[in-house]
């Protein structure tokens, strides 16, 4: 019998498993899916150190291309590119980048700790270290629509549209929805000043091959209000006094746990966690590599907002927001806004592509739960579950639906493992 059974749907489950094993727990990993070699998101240094790994972290450069606008890791190159559209915006870009970087650093520190509570004094002290102006910036920025934030700073439509599109990626909200400025900050955490696209790393490849059991979990066994292990679809039982689930809270608590073990009010709240699919992901295999690494088609904030208007009524936008990242001749395309099951249009992207050899499409919410401000920090995914522990004895959650959420690779698993060790 193991001390811990980890249902590993991704990176976070493996991170939790290895940290618990390093502390002497007997861990069995049930690996439901193969890990991708390339993982998108910032790998916090405490996570890499705890795992004893040295992942290779890369940012595309330029990290954003929107028509003739290119934004680079080199601040001055970005300034010169912006100057072609607006000398005023070019002058403001370094100040904007530094202001956002200061706020992003605060989030980066918060993300490798349990979610802060409203009465958490250490959180209050970290915020106070920003100084009066920094505190005002943070409190004003987090609940803002990203369109208002960008309108405050810039005038060029192409710059505002591209940044706004990144802020609402995979979110069923538009750029004029409250709290979307938080998303721009979230994906800036851990990045160099002036870079608002998550990095990619090879941490998935480094963690490969460490799984013990491959198979699909059919149910989590519960006896007298406490977990006793998991049962696979094959009928095999994997016993353990603690179960850590890297799959979504909805699947964990509503599908894998038998009805009756969860309070009806909490079950209802779990069923209402927003995890709507609003983007279609298309993997294109091209005859040759395109002449760009990233490409964003979002010419203005109004364009992004109109695309969102379509999905509100369950229509796929005919002029969607498109974000593409090329890795040689393989291109990952996100087409937003497309309701789950809708058919995306790639017509706008076609002029920028060499001939397509093959394409594969995936729908759905890739992050288990939408990363909106009301489903973040101490409310992610629900206040009752924000500490990774469930009401069922020995059952913990560590997936991307948990704090801090998508874009911070391994942090949910890291925080969950530390919470288990403290329990």
Model regions: which residues?
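Extreme N-terminal leader/targeting segments of oxidoreductases
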Residues: 1-4, 22-24, 376-378, 383, ...
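N-terminal glycine-rich phosphate/pyrophosphate-binding loop and immediately adjacent elements
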Residues: 2-112
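A conserved FAD-binding loop/helix module that cradles the flavin
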Residues: 40, 400-422
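Helix-rich C-terminal "cap"/substrate-channel and partner-interaction subdomain
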Residues: 95-122, 318-379
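Active-site/ligand-binding neighborhood in enzyme catalytic cores
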Residues: 101-214, 366-369, 373-376
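A glycine-rich dinucleotide-binding beta-alpha-beta segment and adjacent secondary-structure elements
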Residues: 156, 160-172, 306-308, 316-321, ...
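Mid-domain catalytic core of redox enzymes
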Residues: 193-197, 216-328
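Hydrophobic, well-ordered secondary-structure elements that form the walls
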Residues: 244, 284, 333, 349, ...
